[in-house]
């Protein structure tokens, strides 16, 4: 395969809100360029994970190389990166954007600009992308291309008079998109003679080949048989195979500047492939690394514990493999008195957490218990040190803490104006502070500052239900602020259960304590003695529920006779119950853990 001249290469990604049709557009582009035969074509070619097909969302960024004979008579090579649209996978998006020079901004002509469209466009503009707006679903009766054009100009602030109007589903005007790519996006720059500099965009684990890495070549050339070096870790490897995705893997002799492809180098240690690292040649290394992208900082932490303690090592191994494939996921070992050995894991958000849990159970057959998600707090101690708190159970006594800071976010919510009232009420209930409120046509855009702790549990679900699914939501971290926070411990039979403790603002502590106690009362099975369920802040109990004892009629065998006979039996039973209360262990079923942690 000879090298394509730089002027004939276009690297682009597709950015859009969830469900605006970017994976379908990717399918049509692949079809139009004849990369797959009609028999191999299926819907959402690039969403290769079973989970992606099922939920209809893109989780992993995928890449494919297409050849397109344009109207000007030249044959172009197009490298497409399909990116996720959901806020929790923003890290995947930033990686794909770093590897491209331009983007297609897909907007649903019947729905208009959504919050995540906005967030991703700003990321693309930060990466100095040329952006081509595309209006999708123009075949729908509800499509209003003119209104959406005006909206793109007002809200996003990029000219949309030459936006390409298409329908990805029916294939209308796909040619127009390909022409716009070739005409309007810049060609990559690079020098084939310079030392090799390649950005490591992604890596994953293949059962046969070991670790495979996806790179975007900036300068230099990479061929089979080279010895490569990772600039961050200094690890060196012998390249067994270089190739491209057409979407199927196809090996090539070499990759030159501006191209995207994969390397297989028998990499066995997962830790050596840091996404965002620069790959260079061992014998003629580049002087400095490429600017990667900022490492992702986990926002939500939760504990994952194997139900069967023997699966602990298997869980460690599986998490390592997932970490390779998803660089925004972090984990460290921890132990819990109630649940045994497990891991404290960091995620970018709740959907991310759910997807990782689902992938662990599907791809690695693990049965797991997850504890309540919590955010990272900063504790300023009385001795002047600052500590991070990932797990509510580790919070020291209040006397040792000077103050606690909690993370805040800046949330952008876009919603039809008829649902604005309930949305604003929800935000203020969650201690939100309104920053801005603007109207574009019949839609409102509200910008709020909210404590992340209030958003973690079920904010997104509540937002969707009060707006009948119309509201869209996106957020960025917005620093830390001092707050009046307390740890609520849950005691069952006067024993604290560490996996159920959580941190809450003092104003809502009592209400949350009551609701968890009430839930546990319904979920913990009755014993032969009374069980007290309490919520406490320090030593002060703020809520209590009691589960009644199962009654056993010990006097059933007495017919008539003296009362002292019955009294003797009842006293004996009383004595036994007292002893049970002292030594009896209350088993909390797994379903109780899960249900208690879902906040209403």
From Swiss-Prot:
Keywords: Cell inner membrane, Cell membrane, GTP-binding, Hydrolase, Membrane, Nucleotide-binding, Protein biosynthesis. SUPFAM superfamilies: EF-G C-terminal domain-like, P-loop containing nucleoside triphosphate hydrolases. GO terms for molecular function: GTP binding; GTPase activity; guanosine tetraphosphate binding; ribosome binding; translation elongation factor activity. It is a peripheral membrane protein. It catalyses: GTP + H2O = GDP + phosphate + H(+). GO terms for cellular component: plasma membrane. It is found in: Cell inner membrane. Pfam families: EFG_C, GTP_EFTU, GTP_EFTU_D2, LepA_C. Required for accurate and efficient protein synthesis under certain stress conditions. May act as a fidelity factor of the translation reaction, by catalyzing a one-codon backward translocation of tRNAs on improperly translocated ribosomes. Back-translocation proceeds from a post-translocation (POST) complex to a pre-translocation (PRE) complex, thus giving elongation factor G a second chance to translocate the tRNAs correctly. Binds to ribosomes in a GTP-dependent manner. NCBIfam families: lepA, small_GTP. This is Elongation factor 4. The gene is lepA.
């Amino acid at each position: 395969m000879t090298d394509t001249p730089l002027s004939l290469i276009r690297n682009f990604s597709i950015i859009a809100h969830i469900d605006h049709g970017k994976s379908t557009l990717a399918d049509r582009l692949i079809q139009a360029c004849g990369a797959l035969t009609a028999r191999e074509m299926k819907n959402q070619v690039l969403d290769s994970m079973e989970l992606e097909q099922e939920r209809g969302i893109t989780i992993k960024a995928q890449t494919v190389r297409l050849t397109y004979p344009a109207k000007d008579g030249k044959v172009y090579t197009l490298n497409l990166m399909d990116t996720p649209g959901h806020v929790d996978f923003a890290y995947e998006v930033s990686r794909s954007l770093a590897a491209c020079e331009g983007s297609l901004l897909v907007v649903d002509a019947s729905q208009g600009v959504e919050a995540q469209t906005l967030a991703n466009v700003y990321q693309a503009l930060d990466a100095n992308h040329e952006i081509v707006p595309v209006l999708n679903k123009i075949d729908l009766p509800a499509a209003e291309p003119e209104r959406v054009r005006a909206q793109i100009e007002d809200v996003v602030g990029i000219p949309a008079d030459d936006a390409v109007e298409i329908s990805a589903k029916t294939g209308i005007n796909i040619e127009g998109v390909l022409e716009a790519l070739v005409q309007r996006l810049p060609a990559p720059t690079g020098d084939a003679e310079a030392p090799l500099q390649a950005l490591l965009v992604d890596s994953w684990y293949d059962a046969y080949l070991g670790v495979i890495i996806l790179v975007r070549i900036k300068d230099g050339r990479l061929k089979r048989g080279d010895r490569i070096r990772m600039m961050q870790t200094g690890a060196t490897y012998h390249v067994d195979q270089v190739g491209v995705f057409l979407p199927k893997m196809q090996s090539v002799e070499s990759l030159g500047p501006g191209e995207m492809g994969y390397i297989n180098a028998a990499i066995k240690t997962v830790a050596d492939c840091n996404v965002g690292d620069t790959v260079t040649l061992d014998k003629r290394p580049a002087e400095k690394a490429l600017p990667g992208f900022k490492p992702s900082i986990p926002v939500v932490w939760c504990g994952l514990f194997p139900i069967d303690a023997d699966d602990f090592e298997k869980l460690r191994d599986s998490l390592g493999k997932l970490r390779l494939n998803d660089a925004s996921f972090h984990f460290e070992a921890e132990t819990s008195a109630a649940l045994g050995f497990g891991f404290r894991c960091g995620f970018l958000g709740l959907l991310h957490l759910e997807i990782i849990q689902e992938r662990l159970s599907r791809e690695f057959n693990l049965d797991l218990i997850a504890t309540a998600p919590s955010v990272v707090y900063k504790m300023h101690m009385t001795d002047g040190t600052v500590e991070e708190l990932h797990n509510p159970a580790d919070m020291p006594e209040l006397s040792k803490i000077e103050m606690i800071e909690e993370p805040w976010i800046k949330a952008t919510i876009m919603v039809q104006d008829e649902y604005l009232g309930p949305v604003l009420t929800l935000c203020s209930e969650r201690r939100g502070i309104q920053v801005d409120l603007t109207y574009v046509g019949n839609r409102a855009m509200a910008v709020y500052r909210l404590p992340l702790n209030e958003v973690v549990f079920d904010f997104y679900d509540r937002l969707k239900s009060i707006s009948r699914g119309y509201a869209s939501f996106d957020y960025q971290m917005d620093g830390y602020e001092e707050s009046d926070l307390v740890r609520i411990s849950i005691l069952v039979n006067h024993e604290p259960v560490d996996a159920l403790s959580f941190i809450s603002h003092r104003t809502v502590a009592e209400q949350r304590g009551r609701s968890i106690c009430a839930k546990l009362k319904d979920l913990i099975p009755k014993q032969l003695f009374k069980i007290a369920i309490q919520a406490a802040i320090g030593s002060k109990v703020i809520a209590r529920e009691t589960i009644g004892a199962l009654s056993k009629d010990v006097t059933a065998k007495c017919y008539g006779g003296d009362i002292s006979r019955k009294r003797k039996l009842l006293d004996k039973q009383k004595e036994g119950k007292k002893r049970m209360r002292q030594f009896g262990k209350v088993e909390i079923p797994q379903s109780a853990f899960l249900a208690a942690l879902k906040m209403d």
